């Protein structure tokens, strides 16, 4: 009973706007994205030091990632929801109203990262490995934007941790239902655990307890995030669809395949590759991670 009482957290969004100053307004979504970027830069910079990557390059990379990821995330979403934007093309630019797709962001961010890595002559897999923990952390933070916007929620539920959705935000099929699965919370917690797992793997490799090679953390991210997304996407009421199939689930299955094949390639076909996480230098604090 005590556990049920502890988990009895009814979530109700205060609205998408944090504060309004005259004609200007600061929205929760924007604040969360900015916070995710700053925290991601800090985390990846710390990891980069142990991968012999200039930590100052991470801040430069962040600019490239934002430029590549956010427009791609929006365009990905709009492409699969074109019917609602065809008659309102100006709304395509209104990203503050919500409507971005993480898979689009990953595709756009990956393209930007590859271009950046080649320009700076940084090994791509080394760079992706120090970015994916921050990506998972950023997703954990960013999902709360869905909460404030009352979007990307699940099917109706009476669970103690239910999410209240205003009537004007409910799907027509569930217009009489007040409470829904807080899928934003599920994915936020899943991504936070994934971030902690990736950092733990990095530390284990740093201490030479695991033969961590370039690309392993990237593959683990692809597998870990996608497994959670397949489950959570099945609960959502607003999935992007291709016929009767949920696009996010299909993309996640492909990502899992890439992750598994990547691990086989790294450890099976490339056995001569050296371990790439260097041990801590004498006098260098492990607390940096």
From Swiss-Prot:
The record's EC number reads: 2.5.1.145
Instruction: Give the EC class as a word.
Output: transferase
Keywords from UniProt, A to Z, are:
Cell inner membrane, Cell membrane, Membrane, Transferase, Transmembrane, Transmembrane helix
Pathway as given in its UniProt record? Protein modification; lipoprotein biosynthesis (diacylglyceryl transfer)
One GO biological process this protein is involved in is: lipoprotein biosynthetic process
Protein name as annotated: Phosphatidylglycerol--prolipoprotein diacylglyceryl transferase
What is the gene name? Answer: lgt
Q: Which domain of life is it from?
A: Bacteria
Q: Which family does it belong to?
A: Belongs to the Lgt family.
Q: What is its main location?
A: membrane
Do you know which NCBIfam families this protein is assigned to?
lgt
> One GO cellular component from the entry?
plasma membrane
